[in-house]
């Protein structure tokens, strides 16, 4: 989503609160909880999951391995849920031609650097750059090339924009900022 006027362009960036992340976190939680309950059931000798026969799983070695995988999955699931609740990666890109500044803001993980805020002058922007990676995991990422600093990504690597969409976005941004486009 974006908002644009003659002198200001604000591009809102979606973070980790996506349907796919919610689905993966939910599936991983249920699967790892199931593994942990089966491993615990085999250790206790009681059936904690009614639709699964206990006699088929002995504690050593299957119960131990299932408990380990269940605990590992619960840790990964809790990491995903925390990332979703903190909305890591969300923020905005603000391009202000009137004041001659560019502000990039992103939410990070809790701590000292939770708020990531970058500010540049428009005159320091060398170009808008498109990087294309071909192969099985093909991707296109839009970067802003800043003098004296490394390139700053403006799109997510998992955004999967078509070549036409990334070209249109790069052309509009380059026209708005009055800088050239580079393709790598």
From Swiss-Prot:
<feature type="transmembrane region" description="Helical">
    <location>
        <begin position="57"/>
        <end position="77"/>
    </location>
</feature>
<dbReference type="GO" id="GO:0009522">
    <property type="term" value="C:photosystem I"/>
</dbReference>
<keyword id="KW-0602">Photosynthesis</keyword>
<keyword id="KW-0934">Plastid</keyword>
<keyword id="KW-0472">Membrane</keyword>
<dbReference type="GO" id="GO:0055035">
    <property type="term" value="C:plastid thylakoid membrane"/>
</dbReference>
<keyword id="KW-0793">Thylakoid</keyword>
<dbReference type="GO" id="GO:0015979">
    <property type="term" value="P:photosynthesis"/>
</dbReference>
<comment type="similarity">
    <text>Belongs to the Ycf4 family.</text>
</comment>
<comment type="function">
    <text>Seems to be required for the assembly of the photosystem I complex.</text>
</comment>
<protein>
    <recommendedName>
        <fullName>Photosystem I assembly protein Ycf4</fullName>
    </recommendedName>
</protein>
<feature type="transmembrane region" description="Helical">
    <location>
        <begin position="19"/>
        <end position="39"/>
    </location>
</feature>
<keyword id="KW-1133">Transmembrane helix</keyword>
<keyword id="KW-0812">Transmembrane</keyword>
<dbReference type="Pfam" id="PF02392">
    <property type="entry name" value="Ycf4"/>
</dbReference>
<dbReference type="InterPro" id="IPR003359">
    <property type="entry name" value="PSI_Ycf4_assembly"/>
</dbReference>
């Amino acid at each position: 989503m974006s908002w644009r006027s003659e002198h200001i362009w604000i591009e809102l960036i979606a973070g980790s609160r996506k349907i796919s992340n919610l689905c993966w976190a939910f599936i991983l939680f249920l699967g790892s909880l199931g593994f942990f309950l089966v491993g615990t059931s085999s250790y206790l000798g009681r059936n904690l999951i009614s639709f699964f026969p206990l006699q088929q799983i002995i504690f050593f070695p299957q119960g131990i391995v299932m408990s380990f995988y269940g605990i590992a999955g619960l840790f990964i699931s809790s990491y995903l849920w925390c990332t979703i609740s903190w909305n890591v990666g969300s923020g905005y890109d603000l391009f202000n031609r009137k004041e001659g500044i560019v502000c990039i803001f992103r939410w990070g993980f809790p701590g000292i650097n939770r708020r990531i805020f970058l500010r540049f002058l428009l005159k320091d922007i060398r170009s808008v750059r498109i990087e294309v990676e071909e192969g099985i995991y093909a991707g296109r990422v839009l970067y802003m090339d800043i003098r004296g600093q490394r390139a700053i990504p403006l799109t997510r690597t998992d955004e999967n924009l078509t070549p036409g969409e990334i070209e249109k976005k790069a052309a509009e941004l380059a026209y708005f900022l009055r800088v050239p486009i580079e393709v790598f």
